[in-house]
């Protein structure tokens, strides 16, 4: 709230209100375009957490992800370069494949990146990567927030007409997201593992993808101050998963607190 709790002051009988900062709300809109990014970062969670929350999904462990970044022409490149640099360090040496010329000396002094565009491969099964993730001060939800913001810079690809239309408070209509190839950050490949075999994320069923995304968001962002708004989160789930969705929500929610959810659904199972 705006006001802090009143402390006990035996020497003062006055009632005082002490102001305190109100936390800034964090609004995240998660759709299937950012599903791969969120699911990839589940690889930063402990192995046991994924076993507990998604025990009925065989290929629930992210094994390897290839993230493509492209800071060419980005006005905020200097701010985002720090996140890319940390990502390259996390992946380890020789895990970044350049897709642009080497940066000039002035560019390197500003950004500290050898290349403005490249593919970063993170192997979640590599013991050294696991060690670096454990030593890293950033939590998975903080990684997602940083990379999600970088992904949002793709709106710069909107046409001038679309940008002008969005400035009007009365605007009503549909705006297409920029193509994946024009985003400053995108997931090129994501492979999932059952502990022995690996498959591409696209080979998972729609229901498995939906359960990984919806419960993954709860596991990463759920706390006492979080409210999830779900619009038919069960569309691709089988009847058993639909019936138990509220129990799975609570299970994913145990790690951080007591997040709440408002769900719209036509399903009698849910």
Task: Give the positions of each predicted feature.
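Extended helical coiled-coil dimerization/tether regions that scaffold
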Residues: 6-209, 216-227
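Secondary-structure-rich domain cores
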Residues: 1, 182-270
